[in-house]
Regions:
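Active-site mouth loops of central-metabolism enzymes
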Residues: 43-56
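Short hydrophobic/aromatic patch on the recognition helix
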Residues: 497, 501, 546-547, 551
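Core residues of bacterial helix-turn-helix
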Residues: 489-490, 497, 501, 539-540
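Terminal helix-turn-helix DNA-binding modules in bacterial transcription factors
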Residues: 470-475, 480, 484, 503-542, ...
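Key DNA-contact positions within bacterial/archaeal DNA-binding proteins
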Residues: 495, 545, 560
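The short coil/loop that forms the "turn" connecting the two helices of the helix-turn-helix
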Residues: 70, 492, 541-542
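Active-site region of glycoside hydrolase catalytic domains
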Residues: 1-42, 66, 85-86, 95-368, ...
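Catalytic domains of carbohydrate-active enzymes, especially glycoside hydrolases
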Residues: 57-78, 290, 294
Length: 588
């Protein structure tokens, strides 16, 4: 696997989606606090009032992250928790929460990656026009200064805005998200322009206030198109679709990322939006393009496209029955290969996958007390394998954050969706790590090696599951274990393990275990004083009869005969004078 040793393996969540404590310790309301109270806006009238109660349970949650092996955690700071009115008075108790959270993470060697805006805009500032107010970048810069002054002695990684496409497109365009506006394109893009200036101002604020050199990026969500076939025409079509600006929506990459990286809106976008495009000054564009260190993006799925005979881009529909998530998002792992490739080609910045994951409809606690989310394991492994392919081909990907560390409030969808690696029972707040959480821990510990389990067969190198199985057998020879135990250790089904083992080694797994045990016993029996019972026990056999039977079947001798013969041979060799085999060659 090509993951570099310092690859950042993390998981993410955001303040409103997990914290709860919506009005505690002096927190001011956010637009989401108000929006969730509007009848009909959120599925079954859910709110984030309590959510996962992470505000009170953060210590246990961090301990759980550490147990799972997480190396980094992407959290967001609630702006109105820190500044209840959005500007001016600082709420020390609110700021203190993040201070403690960061300490807790660091005490468990988990790197905090802090997002400054993940959609919970202060309601007080919304009443002053929100992102439509040209003052909004200054408000955001001030808020950033407060947070950075407090946390930057320990926090190094910052993300300014989370997915402007979403909070402008859904919050101001179709009204599905807070504040629930349905503005026309001109106003939506103006709000977006201010948000972009806010992004630049936040970078300036971080650079000037940070107590250590900071790594700064943002998180974009503009959509990925991938080629339906590997033909150069389809690849070109996918590139074009991924980087185009469409006049009817703000769902694109380049309108948002060109200004941030190049300092200008894309020509194609200015043409597409025409009169609706915002007026801007050179000074504003300079602020917007304040250099950042990495390009963060969330990728959950992609859309397959191909080139038509006339050269235009057409969507290549998936056949009926193509796998999809509970959200009905298609399972399209190649998006994790093509997205980073196209983005790097254009913006030439190191990439971080700030979110990737799936909402799974079958995530409930089973009779055995566990959550068996095999689909998520399959989803993440195939996505990660595609990301690995991009890395192998030279795309500079620095990190990957699973969305999400735990089930949470999915905005307008309420608690309908479960994206977590950890299941949350919202009535009891009980956390149950899903199978995928343990699996992801293995992936992290092996720096991606565990993904081998899922890599397609056909490569010569034995996959991780085989290597680890062999290692385990050798390291535990004196213990009694069977294939079921081995499979439980590898977190896979016994049949899967046996099949895979046979396929890659040509040997039956149970025969392999017996052979290794007998080889071990043969070494032990070279000691003439060792009792056969002891040899049996030390090579993991339940009793002497079974041991002798297997020994005989595999070597043609009983353990006693072997021991006697070994002794005779050894004694004979001790008494035979050493003679060169070919005396002529010695004298030549
Ligand atoms: C992106 C958003 O940042 C996050 O808040 C949301 O829950 C996930 N997508 C899943 O929709």
């Amino acid at each position: 696997m090509s993951f570099p040793t310092n690859f950042v393996w993390g998981a993410a969540a955001s303040a409103y989606q997990i914290e709860g404590a919506w009005d505690e310790d002096g927190k001011g309301p956010s637009t989401w606090d108000m929006f969730t109270r509007t009848p009909g806006k959120i599925w079954e009238g859910h709110t984030g009032n309590i959510a996962c109660d992470h505000y009170h349970r953060y210590k246990d949650d961090v301990a759980m992250m550490a147990d799972l092996g997480l190396k980094a955690y992407r959290l967001s700071v609630s702006w109105p928790r820190v500044l209840p009115d959005g500007a001016g008075r600082v709420n020390d108790k609110g700021l203190d929460f993040y201070d403690r959270l960061v300490d807790e993470l660091l005490s468990k060697e988990i790197q905090p990656w802090v997002t400054l805006f993940h959609w919970d805009f202060p309601y007080a500032l919304f009443l002053r026009g929100g992102w439509l107010n040209p003052e909004s970048p200054k408000w955001f810069a001030k808020f950033t200064e407060v947070v950075v002054s407090k946390l930057s002695d320990r926090v190094k990684h910052w993300i300014t805005l989370n997915e402007p496409q979403c909070f402008i497109g859904l919050g101001m365009g179709n009204g599905e998200h807070a504040p629930g506006f349905k503005l026309d394109m001109r106003e939506g893009l103006l709000a977006g322009h201010h948000a972009l200036i806010a992004h630049g101002r936040a970078i300036e604020a971080i650079r000037s206030k940070s107590k250590q050199p900071a790594q700064i990026g943002w998180s974009s969500a503009g959509g990925v198109y991938y080629p339906a076939t590997q033909s150069p025409e389809d690849i070109a079509a996918a590139r074009q679709a991924t980087l185009s600006v469409y006049s009817e929506s703000v769902w694109n990459n380049s309108w948002w990322c060109d200004p941030v990286v190049f300092g200008h809106y894309p020509e194609e976008g200015l043409r597409a939006y025409g009169e609706a495009a915002p007026r801007f000054t050179a000074a504003e564009m300079k602020v917007i393009s304040t250099p950042m260190d990495f390009y963060g993006c969330s990728i959950f799925f992609g859309v397959a496209v191909k080139a038509s005979s006339s050269g235009s881009v057409v969507i290549a529909r998936q056949p009926p029955g193509h796998p999809h998530s509970h959200y009905l998002w298609k399972h399209t792992p190649t998006a994790l290969y093509w997205g980073p490739r196209f983005f790097t080609e254009r913006w030439k910045l190191p990439m971080v996958i700030t979110e990737n994951g799936m909402s799974n409809s079958g995530d409930w606690v089973s009779f055995d007390g566990r959550v068996h989310d095999a689909a998520r394991i399959e989803f993440m492994s195939s996505n990660l394998l595609q990301l690995e392919k991009a890395l192998r081909e030279g795309v500079d990907v620095r990190g990957y954050f699973a969305w999400s560390i735990m089930d949470n409030f999915e905005w307008a969808e309420g608690y309908k969706h479960r994206f977590g690696l950890v299941h949350v029972d919202y009535e009891t707040q009980r956390r149950t790590p899903k199978d995928s959480a343990y699996w992801y821990g293995d992936v992290i510990r092996s720096n991606g090696g565990a993904l081998d389990k899922f890599a397609s067969a056909g490569t010569d190198a034995p996959p991780y599951v085989i290597k680890e199985t062999m290692r385990y057998i050798n390291a535990h020879l004196s213990e009694m274990f069977n294939i079921k135990d081995l499979a439980a250790h590898m977190r896979c089904h016994p049949d899967f393990l046996s099949r895979k083992f046979k396929k890659h080694t040509g040997v039956d797994l149970s025969l392999y275990i017996r052979r290794i045990r007998i080889d071990h016993a043969r070494e032990l029996l070279k000691n003439p004083d060792l009792l056969i019972d002891d040899a049996a026990e030390q090579s993991g056999f339940t009793d002497r009869i079974h041991f002798s039977k297997v020994f005989r079947r595999l070597t043609g001798q009983t353990p006693g005969q072997y021991q006697r013969q070994f002794r005779v041979e050894r004694d004979a060799s001790l008494h035979t004078p050493l003679k060169p085999k070919n005396p002529r060659s010695v004298h030549a």
